[in-house]
Amino acid sequence: MGDVARSNLIFGLHVHVGVPNREEGIRIQNIARYFLPHIYAISTCSPFWEGRNTGFKSFRQKIFAKFPRTGIPSHFNSWADFEQYVNILIKTGTIDNAKKIWWDLRVHPIYPTIEFRICDMPLRIEETLCLAAIMQCIVAKIYKLHQQNISFRNYRRILINENKWRASRYGIDAELIDFGKEIAVPYEKILDELLEFIDDVVDELDCRSKNRVRDF
C-alpha cells in the first residue's frame, strides 16, 4: 500500500469482549456503534505527528483512515447480511479474508468476540483497565436489553461520524451531538449518560473498581 502503509506508525488500543454467537455480535455491533465517539474522546492522546502539533486531540485516526475498510461500520441486518458483504469482497479479489476489515468496531472473524478498535493507546494501565471495563459494560448492557426484548435506537453512520470527528478534534473538551434531542451538549453530560446507561451491569461484571473514568 505504498506510503499509506509506511505512514502507519501509530498505536491503538484493541479490546475484545466475548459474545454468545456471531448473530448476537452483529446486533450488539449495530447498537454499540453509537457509543464509539464517547469512549474515543476519553482516550484521545495523539496530538503530534512528525514533530508538529496537529491541532487534534487524536490524529492517529486520521492516519489510519487512509486505509480502506476503516471507520464506523455500517448497519447490518444479520450475520448473513455481513457474510454476503464479505463474500463479495473476497470474490472480487478485494480481500482474502475478513481480517482485512479494519473498522472501529467489528465482530471478530476468528475469535468469539466483538472487538473495539477506535481508542488511542492510554498512557497509564489504570486508564486502559477503565476503558476496557466501559467497553465490556456496553456490550453486556446491550445484550441484556436484547434478552429483555427492549430496543435501542439505531443511529446512522453519517450521524455517528459527526461525533467521531468532534471527539478526534477536541477530545473531552468536545460538544457531542445528542441525536435524540438534536442538540450539541458538553462531553461531560454525554459521559454521565453513558455511565448511567451501563450502571446496572457494572457490579454484575465486578467492574466498579475499574470504572473510575472521573480520575482521568
Give the ranges of each region predicted by the language model.
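C-terminal accessory/tail domains of diverse enzymes
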Residues: 3, 64-216
